[in-house]
Amino acid sequence: MADNQGVQKAGDVKIEQLKLISSTNVIYDLTEFLIELNLYEDIFSNYLTGSIVLSDSRNLFDMVPIIGEEYLVLKFITPSFPTSVQKTFRIYKTSDRQVVRDKNTQTYVLHFASIELFYDVLLPLFTPFEGEITDIVGDLFDSYIAENRDFQISEAADEIKEIENVTPLYVKSETANKVKFVSPGWTPFKCINWLASKSIPKDGKAKNFLFFESNKSFCFTSIETLFREAYEDNTSIGKYSISAAGIRQSDNRPDIDREYFLAKDVEMVDTTDHIKNYTNGYLANRLLTLDVYNKEYVVTDYDYINEYGKQYHTSGEGKKAMPIFTGDSLRNPATNISFYPVNPKLFNDFPDNVSEKMKDIYGNRKSSLLDLTNLRMNISVPGRTDVEVGRILYFSYPAVSPSDSSDANETQEDTNYSGYYLITAIRHKVSKMNHTMVMEIVKDSLTTEKTVK
């Protein structure tokens, strides 16, 4: 973390730019109108979204006019931190417009999303692709998504120019399989999502690839890679615990370093539902691959309990991670059956295309992604602009009673719910003076011997 110089309290924020660029290239500073800005990122979303609640006593809505096709230049930073959240977005909708304060002020909400989304939805592709999956993903991104779509605004706010500030794509996991297909009018994002669902990693066992945008970059990776990197490189963002009131140093000043890692409004969203897991394919599932050329079918059963120890999890290596089930847990692959067509003669010069690999991918991917739905929490913490989805944190969930008469409650952890969690979604709530993150965190294993100090 940064040295906190210039930070008065955890959650301090500096909004360096909040500019609206109209369809006629007129610039408006929205900072004085701001009530609250919300920025959303999610590992299951290809792009960022957000909304701004504005209080307008100057009739900006009609003066611009705001019609839902404006650009939003956003930059905010945690004071003394090295990284900021910076991006140019596109306004796509207005809502909740109402007059308040004796008809002298109006409030409304502007909804925005990543600029890349608008180029994506308007670009159906009818194009053939062939090669390594990660190479195709890179080509799709470079050719159709990664263009210069950022703006630089002068301090005098009277000049706009486009700059080379492309949101980068990081491919964290290389794939081992090749694919050949023709896009049937899919957009670039849909093509990449389809490729993610058909990817086999070069390193690792889990076929849980995703394509998403964080507040720093686009990312194409397997979830297992995120777990392995955090575990091997010790890149957890820190140890969080539930907030207690009145935490101060002896000089009665806030302990800012500690308060950054105090969570409040902790909500347990999902816990293990074994009846659901018996039937949704999590513990075991079956795939019927139908060969439309040879008129044959193959039954492939996948048993996650037998495969769990071969993969990395939130707690680290599979052989050290403790699953939420036992080796004797009930399961029957026939409770969850799926079908997939195989056409080995679709391309004469391309054997082992993706359809022939699905028996190795489908069950593994289904189980490992469902593993992220068993233990899920929402926590509210002071905002930091160096945090993004896809990172790992340690959350200390308190035990309700001491282990013996000599122990203090506050030093004990619940062994089931404490441990490493993956940040799957963040809602950044930003006002003029404060930044709060509401984080969705999940784990796919229970506490192991390795702990965070």
Regions found by a protein language model. Give the residues of each.
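Envelope-exposed proteins and targeting segments
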Residues: 14-16, 48-50, 70, 85-87, ...
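Assembly/oligomerization scaffold segments
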Residues: 1-124
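Short beta-strand-centered interaction patches in the first periplasmic/extracellular domains
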Residues: 107, 156-273, 279
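Solvent-exposed coil/turn segments that connect beta secondary-structure elements
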Residues: 42, 55-57, 77-79, 92-99, ...
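Glycine-rich, acidic and aromatic/proline-enriched surface loops and short helix-turn segments
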Residues: 105-106, 111-118, 130-169
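Second-shell loop/turn segments in exported
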Residues: 121-131, 177-183
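An acidic/polar, Gly/Ser/Thr-rich interaction patch typically located in mid-to-C-terminal regions
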Residues: 39-65, 242-453
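Sec/Tat-exported extracytoplasmic proteins
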Residues: 62, 144, 196-199, 203, ...
